[in-house]
Structures are given as C-alpha cells and as structure tokens.
UniProtKB/Swiss-Prot annotation:
It comes from Geobacillus thermodenitrificans (strain NG80-2). InterPro entries: Aldolase_TIM, ThiamineP_synth_sf, ThiamineP_synth_TenI, TMP_synthase. Pathway: Cofactor biosynthesis; thiamine diphosphate biosynthesis; thiamine phosphate from 4-amino-2-methyl-5-diphosphomethylpyrimidine and 4-methyl-5-(2-phosphoethyl)-thiazole: step 1/1. The gene is thiE. 4-amino-2-methyl-5-(diphosphooxymethyl)pyrimidine binds at Q44, F45, R46, E47, K48, N79, S117, K146. Binds 1 Mg(2+) ion per subunit. Transmembrane segments: none annotated. One of its GO terms (cellular component) is cytoplasm. SUPFAM superfamilies: Thiamin phosphate synthase. 2-[(2R,5Z)-2-carboxy-4-methylthiazol-5(2H)-ylidene]ethyl phosphate binds at T143, R144, S145, G175, I195, S196. GO terms for molecular function: magnesium ion binding; thiamine-phosphate diphosphorylase activity. The lineage of its organism: Bacteria, Bacillati, Bacillota, Bacilli, Bacillales. This is Thiamine-phosphate synthase.
Amino acid sequence: MARITSEEMKERLAVYFIMGSQNSERPAEDVLKEALDGGVTLFQFREKGSAALEGEEKEALARQLQRLCRTYGVPFIVNDDVELAIAIDADGVHVGQDDEDARRVREKIGDKILGVSAHNVEEARAAIEAGADYIGVGPIYPTRSKDDANEAQGPGILRHLREQGITIPIVAIGGITADNTRAVIEAGADGVSVISAIASAPEPKAAAAALATAVREANLR
Ligand SMILES: Nc1nc(C(F)(F)F)ncc1COP(=O)(O)OP(=O)(O)O
Ligand SMILES: [Mg+2]
C-alpha cells in the first residue's frame, strides 16, 4: 500500500469526526453510525479522560468502530496509541506535540496515514519533515472537548501558515461548528474536525450533513 496522496488526504479531511466512549451518553457505535450516514469522511478514535477505557476494553471498542468505518469505506485513525493502531491494523495515527515523536511514529507505521498537531509554523515544518500526511491546527475556537487545550488562536493562524508557504493538508480543530466552518475553510483549512458538534448533537446524522454542506459550499466560493 502506498502513502495517501495529498489530494486524497485533503478530500478525506473535509468532515473529520473524532470521538471516544467519553464523548456521548449514547453508545459510541450508535453515534458513529449516524455520523457516517450523515457524510463523515474520516474518523479518529480518541479514548481520553478520567473514565477512558483501557486495555482489552479499549481495543474491543476500537475494533468495533473500525469495523463500522470499514463498511462505509471511511479510514479509521487512532489518537495517541501507536501500538494499538498497529495491533488492529488501523489506517493511521494522530500524535500531538506531547506524544511519541512523529519521526519515530512514521518509522513504525510505514505508509499508514500520519497526522500531527501543530500550533505554529515551526511545529508545522517539523511535522512535514517528520513525514506527516496532514496537520491538525487549533484550537481555532474555545473547546470543552480537550481539558488541556491551548488558548484559542482564531482562523488567523490558518491564514498565517498558508502565507508562510505551508502547503500540507490542514484540518482545523477546536470549537468548530457548521456556522464557523466557512471562516476556517476560507482561511486555508482543507477540512474541519469536530467532537461535540456531532457527538453532542441531538441528531448526529443531521449535524454531520450540515458540516459537509458548509465545507462544500465554502470550497465553491
Ligand atoms: N487529537 C487531535 N486530532 C487532530 C486532528 F487533526 F485529527 F483533527 N488535531 C489535534 C488533535 C489534538 O492532539 P493532541 O494535542 O495530542 O491532544 P489529544 O491527544 O488530547 O487529542
Ligand atoms: Mg495526543
């Protein structure tokens, strides 16, 4: 299997749903199915928080959600846990600045998708050097989904990265909704990643569809 192309990566980043067992009162599988029906293009399993599953329970949930994504042809990305991603043959991993070194992760995962969090030009350039296929930039707006999140940066960081010649596929993260999606796409993001905008929505399918429409319309401008 070859590395994903930049063009396909950008398409996959359009509506990037992220969740784990702690992000909804409902079973994760039910929420994910509705999100996939609504048009989610990429999924990240992010199992974090004080009551996060561990060990066999975490792997069992990962495999369950991976199976669901496979039926929709949507790539399955694992957050932080590189060993789990390899054990279940996930489609990729996402690591942040405080996780395993991205260069080391690239060596371990071969051609799988590698996503890296970046907050500035230096971190973006380092991620590219390390072999990232995309970078997650944010939090763009205040978020309640990550208790150790940095200060919200606003869409300006996206514009700044593009002005500094960063051309790697970028997904915006942090407080993203269908209402602010146009601003982040116009500022230079290729897609949006969300947790609560879908996982906490009364209708995850409609929420995913609204995000997909907002990204599509912003790209037409
Ligand atoms: N999980 C993420 N996914 C993305 C993605 F690009 F995929 F949208 N961007 C950023 C993060 C944040 O990654 P990190 O800084 O390690 O914190 P955590 O492990 O708590 O998520
Ligand atoms: Mg992390």
